[in-house]
Amino acid sequence: MGNFIAEIAIIKPLHNLFDYEIPNTFKYVTPGSRVTVEFGKKLVTGFVINIKKETKLSNTKLKKIIEIIDDTPVLDEEILNLFKWVSNYYHAPLGQVIGLGTPSYLRNGKEIFDANYNTKNFKEDELENTFNLTKEQLI
């Protein structure tokens, strides 16, 4: 098998990680990346935990990653290690630990936006005239 395999944590109460083939068109899949995969008959968001070269599954059973959601991993190595430790210590499914430890927009596969993008920089004189408060309102 020429392609690499990603071990994916799905945010469900399951103790297993699931193997998915990384298509050749996806260049930057690393641990901590969010991906969209087919799980059963649904498309779900998963988190890449590990990259490996081999799997015990046959080629016919191995599904491919459908989409990489972010350009860079959303979970760094330190956070991933913390989630793994919590999962091991409390005997909790890794996918659920990640689900509890991340904001809902990450779990739901939504794009991350930059809060500073496309904001207007105000000049001081513009800010001074923004509010015309009375003396009673200032107290």
Regions found by a protein language model. Name each.
Residues 1-139:
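Accessory, non-ATPase domains that flank or precede helicase/AAA+ motor cores in DNA-metabolism machines
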